[in-house]
Swiss-Prot record:
Pfam families: YidD. Its main location: membrane. It comes from the Bacteria. The keyword S-adenosyl-L-methionine does not apply. It is a peripheral membrane protein. This is Putative membrane protein insertion efficiency factor. InterPro entries: Membr_insert_effic_factor_YidD. Keywords: Cell inner membrane, Cell membrane, Membrane. NCBIfam families: membrane protein insertion efficiency factor YidD. It is found in: Cell inner membrane.
């Protein structure tokens, strides 16, 4: 079971949902990844919390550009550790 969300995490998820409902339909589908970057952000914040979830989301959004082919890029599992040893 996921830990309870902090108020800031809920706010960030609300902002992403607002983007999904208001801005994204105006821009049309252009995300190169599955799940979309906005859905990835919601999942990452829910899974890892505000700090790490936001960091993963930022890295994902920066990869979403015309030179990247995109494709499947799910949120890493909870035990994911990207630190280099």
């Amino acid at each position: 079971m996921a830990p309870p969300l902090s108020p800031v995490s809920k706010l960030l998820i609300g902002l992403i949902r607002g983007y999904q409902l208001v801005i994204s339909p105006l821009l049309g589908p252009h995300c190169r990844f599955r799940p979309t970057c906005s859905q990835y952000g919601i999942e990452a914040i829910r899974r890892f919390g505000m700090l790490k979830g936001s960091w993963l989301t930022l890295k994902r959004v920066l990869k979403c550009h015309p030179l990247n082919p995109g494709g499947e890029d799910p949120v890493p599992p909870k035990n994911f550790d990207n630190r280099e040893h």
